[in-house]
């Protein structure tokens, strides 16, 4: 192959890679909005409004990794994420005196999900990751709205065989008004009747789990005790699924 032909080949290959990157980013943006949104602003009847006033405002505890986001650092890419997939944002933190860059992918519809549920619940972030990482991710997801102010990190977890567990009573002593959304059953093994299971997410741009939860969460806030509903949930996800912590 002549030098001219090689130059043409490299130019075309570069243009193709740019086009492919743009297509993936555009497709992800499209997938986020192709599903009909949940109509959360429909006026409630006087009876419904009265019912809501008679129960306590609930607390929704949110996990981060593989629940709301997926991240990888400095070229370490899971097989489930296609090489070249653009991240939604990056964060730079110092871990053990070493600077580390994380590329973070947001689960589809996470921003809309947080906007809606923050009107219904007090939101609390509880991650088994280190504070320097988890706090930076929470800041990005909050987008300056002040809806993710309360945060708990690895130092607030209990290390047991099989991983970290999260003590919900440390967030609020009244367990009747608190629920946790987490992809790891081990994290809430001591509070199974307060748990809302969700499949782990890594890269699927067509995922709608967060959207699908909105009608359920809308109804759950009217209960006097969330455990009366969540204890009936038989959809227990395998406890052996892989969880990564930073």
From Swiss-Prot:
GO terms for cellular component: cytoplasm; endoplasmic reticulum membrane; Nem1-Spo7 phosphatase complex; nuclear envelope; nuclear membrane. It is a single-pass membrane protein. The chain crosses the membrane at residues 3-23. It catalyses: O-phospho-L-seryl-[protein] + H2O = L-seryl-[protein] + phosphate; O-phospho-L-threonyl-[protein] + H2O = L-threonyl-[protein] + phosphate. The keyword Hydrolase applies. Its main location: membrane. GO terms for molecular function: phosphoprotein phosphatase activity; protein serine/threonine phosphatase activity. It is found in: Membrane. Disulfide bonds: none annotated. It comes from the Eukaryota. Gene3D superfamilies: HAD superfamily/HAD-like. InterPro entries: Dullard_phosphatase, FCP1_dom, HAD-like_sf, HAD_sf, TIM50. GO terms for biological process: nuclear envelope organization; positive regulation of triglyceride biosynthetic process. Its EC number is 3.1.3.16. Keywords: Hydrolase, Membrane, Protein phosphatase, Transmembrane, Transmembrane helix. SUPFAM superfamilies: HAD-like. Residues 53-220 form the FCP1 homology domain. Serine/threonine protein phosphatase that may dephosphorylate and activate lipin-like phosphatases. Lipins are phosphatidate phosphatases that catalyze the conversion of phosphatidic acid to diacylglycerol and control the metabolism of fatty acids at different levels. May indirectly modulate the lipid composition of nuclear and/or endoplasmic reticulum membranes and be required for proper nuclear membrane morphology and/or dynamics. May also indirectly regulate the production of lipid droplets and triacylglycerol. PANTHER family: DULLARD PROTEIN PHOSPHATASE (PTHR12210). Belongs to the dullard family. This is CTD nuclear envelope phosphatase 1 homolog.
